């Protein structure tokens, strides 16, 4: 195979990697946790990643404890789990 062919193949493989959606294997484990409001009673609008729907959804966080699948913004949730 010529060097031009190798460069083309390398370019196509790179493009395929960039355009391929993230699989559940690539997501941090925290993205698989269920939403957890925690025991406190403050009501903070927050976001969690729902692996079944493959998107970030809003939930109410109580303000303490809970788990790591808890994001202040939808954008933060998406960049961590749905990228």
From Swiss-Prot:
Supply the InterPro entries for this chain: Kunitz_BPTI (IPR002223), Kunitz_BPTI_sf (IPR036880), Prtase_inh_Kunz-CS (IPR020901), TFPI/VKTCI-like (IPR050098)
Identify a single GO molecular function assigned to this protein.
serine-type endopeptidase inhibitor activity
Which tissues carry this protein? Expressed by the venom gland.
Q: Give the residue range of the signal peptide.
A: 1-24
**One GO CC annotation:** extracellular space
How is this protein named in the record? Kunitz-type serine protease inhibitor textilinin-2
Note the site residues: Reactive bond for trypsin. Answer: 41-42
Q: What family is it from?
A: Belongs to the venom Kunitz-type family.
Q: What does this protein do?
A: Serine protease inhibitor that inhibits plasmin (Ki=2.2 nM). In vivo, reduces blood loss in a mouse tail vein bleeding model.
Question: What organism is this sequence from?
Answer: Pseudonaja textilis textilis
Cysteine-cysteine disulfides: 31-81, 40-64, 56-77
| Annotated BPTI/Kunitz inhibitor domain residues | 31-81
> What lineage, starting at the top, does this entry show?
Eukaryota, Metazoa, Chordata, Craniata, Vertebrata
Q: Which domain of life is it from?
A: Eukaryota
* UniProt-listed PANTHER family: KUNITZ-TYPE PROTEASE INHIBITOR-RELATED, SERINE PEPTIDASE INHIBITOR, KUNITZ TYPE, 3
Q: Repeat as a keyword? A: no
Q: Please provide the record's keywords in A-Z order.
A: Disulfide bond, Protease inhibitor, Secreted, Serine protease inhibitor, Signal
Q: Where does it mainly reside?
A: secreted
A Pfam family that the UniProt record links to this protein = Kunitz_BPTI
- State the compartments where it is located: Secreted
UniProt key word Secreted: yes
PROSITE patterns membership: BPTI_KUNITZ_1, BPTI_KUNITZ_2
């Amino acid at each position: 195979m010529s060097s031009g062919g190798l460069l083309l193949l390398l370019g196509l493989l790179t493009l395929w990697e960039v355009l391929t959606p993230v699989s559940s294997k690539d997501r941090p484990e925290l993205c698989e946790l269920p939403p957890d409001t925690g025991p406190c009673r403050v009501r903070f609008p927050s976001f969690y990643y729902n692996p079944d729907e493959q998107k970030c959804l809003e939930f109410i966080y109580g303000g303490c404890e809970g788990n790591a699948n808890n994001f202040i913004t939808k954008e933060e949730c998406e960049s961590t789990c749905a990228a």
